[in-house]
Amino acid sequence: SAELSEVNLESINSLFNDLSSKPLITDMDVNIQELNVYGYKILNANIKYVPTNKNVSIQILSNDVVGNILWDSKENLLKAGFEKLHLKKNNTLVDDESKFIFSDAPKINIKAKSLMLDEDAYGDLSLIAFKENKMWNIESFKIISPDHTINGSGLWDDEGLSPNTSINFSWDIANIEKTFDQLSYPELIKDGKASVIGMLSWPKSPFDFDKSTLKGNFSLTATDGVVLEAKPGVARLFGLLTLQNLPRRLSLDFSDIFSKGFIFDKINAGVIVNNGILKSNRFSMVGPAAEVSIKGETNIIEETQNIHVIVNPRISDSLSLLSLAGGPLAGAAAFIAQKILKDPLNKIMSDEYQIIGTWDEPEEIQTPQIERFGEMISQEILQPSSEFLNIK
């Protein structure tokens, strides 16, 4: 066995070249203090290398990585299986030192039961990729956690003047609350399910993800959850959207409804991503208490936002239910009248405002509405009433 202080795995790729001839090394047992693997590092690793029958078997054992790599020269296939693959970014490497170099790039099939990059845990990973026309074709990748699953495919140009990664993905979330906890956004949403479908691209490799250079778009659908009370940071912004200030704005007492968050039946959104800025002209959140529509943008790098919010509380339906105290006929009449009048209470009591500033200290700007109340009353109540009662 041998002891080495620092090794780039890419620098010994000659071991894998021309495996039809006798390998340069018959076997190897090396302890490496720092093993650099495409921009990430493995500390205090034991590497065992054994070529057999024109194949190469490598065993890697460390506190952070446990697995085996098999090179099938006949099929030009690199298969890797890891019980644990916990990698830490090596920020001391320059780009040229982290090139994924092979003289004849193999097809890659990687499985890892526990993937972690830096401090971010991703779960179970499977990846199939091959190189074609100087570009890596990511045939498929899947990340499975107990509460969510990501499927995708994509392309990775690692040889051009401007390296780039682009992926198409679908993200199925069985439990939003637990998934957000895993992503370090605890106590933001309770329960809930979601589906996210989109396309994203960024410079450099799939492993060198930088949200400040992220571009693309995605659609979001979420159901049956609760946006919880305001917390510091991004959750503070969500807190504003839970309508906890709505009772003050409407001078009505809804504290029993909103004190513990906003229950939503469904959230729909289409989002454009451009260099870390998320923009949406169609974000809607519907719940038993209100309908919320949002458009604007938020900067996930600077943690700021400029969004326009319209809140339509579902007051008329609630009042219809309360009117049942006067008897079933009274309740039914109130409900039908409100629907014929196109929910005038909901529209008159709607709230409109702008949220700017930072996530930690958002600033709320109320939009004046008094001047439009007269017109709204005429359009939504007087005119429909006249038509319904056949008044001329």
Where are the regions a protein language model picked out?
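Small-residue helix/turn framework positions
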Residues: 2-15, 25-36, 61-121, 126-356, ...
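Extracellular beta-sheet-rich ligand-binding/adhesion modules
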Residues: 36, 44-46
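N-terminal beta-strand/beta-hairpin edge segment
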Residues: 45, 54-58, 141
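Aromatic-rich beta-strand edge motifs centered on tyrosine
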Residues: 49-51, 131
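C-terminal accessory extensions/subdomains outside the catalytic/core fold
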Residues: 360, 366, 379-380
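Short, solvent-exposed mixed-charge patches
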Residues: 390-392
